[in-house]
Amino acid sequence: MNKLLIIDGMNLVRRIHAAQPNESDITGLKERVHGACRKLLKYHIPTHAAIVWDGDAISWRKTLFPDYKKGRKPMPEALANGLNDIKAYLAEHHIHSVDADSEADDVIATLATKLVNIDGEAIIVSTDKGFSQLNHPKIKLWDHFNQTYLTIEEMEKKLGIERSQLIDYLALAGDSGNKIPGVPGIGPKSAVELLRIYRSLASIYNSIDKVGAKQAKKLEAGKQMARLSYKLVQLKTDMPLSVNLKQFRIKKPDSE
């Protein structure tokens, strides 16, 4: 069975770089990133591997909602200037890079979905909880920094919802890290309680007359924001890709 290791490039690199006291110093960074990739390959033993990078184009999410990710700390200039060197170094060691036009998330989701649809297995290396919405038994999420899988049970316990409700939850409660608004006045606790009773965002709005007056007023006022937030958090799994699985095959063990 084909097993594809998909690494969220910027998620990995920025966290490795964050351990550096001086953000302008990228000395040894490419070697540390390569070391992390070697460790991932050794542990998971995939048949194929790719590291996916964000691109510079404005994402469809930013076009839809200009405040998306607004205020997020920009990438340090030294790191931005060193990315091509990191990619080249990884390529020398047989780790294939995929450059997304804008956000890597949708490309990662598409790669994973395409593979499991042909009976393969995908392991996504990222700390981004948004990938939890890819509800398939052969798609696994690996947190490299905590050296653990993000399990369904752990996510459900942490958020108080079922995995299938993640998009509905974020549409209601929002996601401050990505500046996704959610419904004003409906926080995490209210979102969990509403989903416990009504199960989904659509059912909540279809049952608005049964919701308490105070919450119903907030939900009605924030209906458009809920719809917008739902779109923003939902991963696309049908992105056009100009790559094929053969490109990602691991040609030989990386034993350097």
Curated annotation (Swiss-Prot):
Q: Which InterPro entries match?
A: 5-3_exonucl_a-hlix_arch_N, 5-3_exonuclease, 5-3_exonuclease_C_sf, DNA_polI_H3TH, FEN, HhH2, PIN-like_dom_sf, Xni
Residue ranges of the region described as Interaction with DNA: 185-190
Keyword presence, DNA-binding: yes
5'-3' exonuclease domain mapped to chain residues: 163-256
Q: Does the keyword Metal-binding apply?
A: yes
Its needed co-factors are: Mg(2+); K(+)
**What UniProt keywords apply to this chain's record, in alphabetical order?**
DNA-binding, Endonuclease, Hydrolase, Magnesium, Metal-binding, Nuclease, Potassium
What's an example of a GO molecular-function annotation for this chain? magnesium ion binding
- Give binding positions for Mg(2+): 105
Report the EC code(s) recorded for this entry: 3.1.-.-
- Pfam families recorded for this chain? 5_3_exonuc (PF01367), 5_3_exonuc_N (PF02739)
- Residues engaged in binding K(+): 172-173, 181, 183, 186
Tell me how the cofactor is bound. Binds 2 Mg(2+) per subunit. Only one magnesium ion has a direct interaction with the protein, the other interactions are indirect. Binds 1 K(+) per subunit. The potassium ion strongly increases the affinity for DNA.
Q: Which Gene3D superfamilies match?
A: 5' to 3' exonuclease, C-terminal subdomain, 5'-nuclease
Set out the biological process GO terms recorded for this chain's protein: DNA replication, Okazaki fragment processing
Similarity comment: family membership: Belongs to the Xni family.
> What function does this protein fulfil?
Has flap endonuclease activity. During DNA replication, flap endonucleases cleave the 5'-overhanging flap structure that is generated by displacement synthesis when DNA polymerase encounters the 5'-end of a downstream Okazaki fragment.
Name of the molecule in the record: Flap endonuclease Xni
Lineage from the top down? Answer: Bacteria, Pseudomonadati, Pseudomonadota, Gammaproteobacteria, Alteromonadales
